[in-house]
């Protein structure tokens, strides 16, 4: 027997019973971002490797260990996108969208990272990305956070996700803090784990994000970035916090919050849940004013966020009842009436376009069809048999309530269904 081919580890199939949650989530994303008049942009999943090395940072875990990179037939180094911001900026510069313009853009699609697969972490994963260009102040950052909160409310998730904030300040203040942090950590290098010792010489800010419990006392005594902020950075962060307070958006200032991408400045934020274990971050973002210039464009203020759809789906399954709803399951009794049943079902769809109607065209027994009807979650079973066709009637059975089934003429069926809706 030929051995079957399996999916690549960490790249999972999304099965039909899961799709309703994905559709619900994706529709909510589109609805919320459109309400703020953000416009969709689409760009390739494959980019030149140099794009990510320049923007994400060569010393980051993503570039060092996680990217899917290959050489094509022309000898060019290409990479499956590990995140969307760099590609969005590249597309904006190349197509003239960013020069002296204000832009509000969004995208939704797959990203790829060679990480260790676990619950909520995959090698192919989907993100909603939202990016803004041309607006330098804290108000646009507040708008992004308001948008996130509106999305959580639309999904019914606002009670299980909380907001954490920090500021990295300007590049100058960040560099001053970096030096102070390195000096402190070097004085206690023997207490660091192997991963942190490596990061000490490549990306020391990432040590603050360590989940190793043995390092937490050491990190608690580390210099605080807020003590190295210049006055402009302080005012910026104070204004953002004031806006969130006025809008009654609860938040926690987390001084150890840093992002794993080198291009962030000023504000960074994460939306976090305690219901997914180690993979608690469901959305993250911040400001990255230097990124457009880094990629060859004119200096342009920019801010945005990305939300992980797989993690949001995991949360959705815990709070939303089954989203795969059927209104009517049409039971067709006997092969002789399948054609008539099919045509009648199509007529029902014509007059009830918002209803979900499934016709059983299997020709199997009534018992089997009623089992499938009940399992489908449908509210009604509509029975079409030879006797009903002769008398121009149908039998309507309520599957979710214990009430007598009804025999209705075809003329009275539609008004009755609409009244019972």
Curated annotation (Swiss-Prot):
Entry keyword set: Aminoacyl-tRNA synthetase, ATP-binding, Cytoplasm, Ligase, Nucleotide-binding, Protein biosynthesis
A GO biological process held by the record: histidyl-tRNA aminoacylation
Domain of life: Bacteria
EC number(s) given by UniProt: 6.1.1.21
EC top class named in words: ligase
Transmembrane domains' residue ranges: none
Entries under Gene3D superfamilies matching the protein: Anticodon-binding domain (3.40.50.800), Bira Bifunctional Protein, Domain 2 (3.30.930.10)
Catalytic activity: tRNA(His) + L-histidine + ATP = L-histidyl-tRNA(His) + AMP + diphosphate + H(+)
Subcellular location(s) per record: Cytoplasm
UniProt xrefs under Pfam families: HGTP_anticodon, tRNA-synt_His
Assembly and oligomerization: Homodimer.
Protein's name in the database: Histidine--tRNA ligase
Lineage: Bacteria, Pseudomonadati, Pseudomonadota, Gammaproteobacteria, Legionellales
């Amino acid at each position: 027997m030929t051995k079957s081919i399996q999916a690549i580890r960490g790249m999972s199939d999304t099965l039909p019973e899961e799709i309703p949650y994905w559709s619900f989530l994706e529709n909510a994303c589109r609805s919320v971002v459109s309400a703020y008049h953000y416009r969709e942009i689409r760009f390739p999943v494959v980019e030149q490797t140099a794009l990510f090395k320049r923007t994400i940072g060569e010393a980051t875990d993503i570039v060092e260990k996680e990217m899917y990179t290959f050489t094509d037939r022309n000898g060019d180094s290409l990479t499956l996108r590990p995140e969307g911001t760099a590609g969005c900026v590249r597309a904006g510069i190349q197509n003239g969208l960013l020069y002296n313009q204000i832009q509000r853009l969004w995208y939704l699609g797959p990203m790829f990272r060679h990480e260790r697969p676990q619950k909520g972490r995959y090698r192919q994963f989907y993100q909603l990305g939202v990016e803004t260009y041309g607006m330098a102040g804290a108000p646009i950052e507040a708008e992004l956070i308001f948008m996130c909160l509106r999305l959580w409310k639309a999904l019914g998730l606002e009670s299980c996700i909380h907001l954490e904030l920090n500021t990295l300040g300007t590049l100058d203040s960040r560099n001053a803090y970096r030096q102070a942090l390195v000096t402190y950590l070097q004085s206690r290098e023997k207490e660091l784990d192997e991963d942190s010792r490596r990061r000490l010489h490549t990306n020391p800010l990432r040590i603050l994000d360590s989940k190793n419990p043995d390092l937490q006392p050491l990190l608690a005594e580390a210099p605080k970035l807020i003590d190295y902020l210049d006055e402009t950075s302080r005012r910026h962060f104070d204004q953002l916090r004031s806006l969130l307070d006025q809008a009654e958006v609860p938040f926690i200032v987390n001084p150890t919050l840093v992002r794993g991408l080198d291009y962030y400045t000023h504000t960074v934020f994460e939306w976090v849940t305690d219901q997914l274990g180690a993979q608690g971050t469901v959305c993250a973002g911040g400001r990255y004013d230097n990124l457009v210039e880094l990629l060859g464009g004119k200096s342009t203020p920019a801010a945005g966020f990305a939300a992980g759809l797989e993690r949001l789906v995991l949360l959705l399954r815990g709070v939303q009842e089954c989203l795969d709803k059927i209104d009517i399951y049409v039971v067709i009794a006997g092969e002789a009436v399948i054609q008539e049943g099919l045509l009648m079902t199509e007529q029902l769809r014509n007059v009830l376009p918002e209803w979900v109607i499934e016709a059983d065209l299997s020709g199997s027994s009534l018992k089997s069809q009623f089992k499938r009807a009940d399992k489908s979650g449908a509210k009604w079973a509509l029975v079409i048999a030879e006797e009903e066709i002769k008398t121009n009637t149908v039998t309507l059975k309520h599957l979710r309530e214990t009430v007598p089934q009804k025999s209705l003429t075809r003329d009275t069926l539609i008004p009755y269904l609409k009244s019972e809706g």
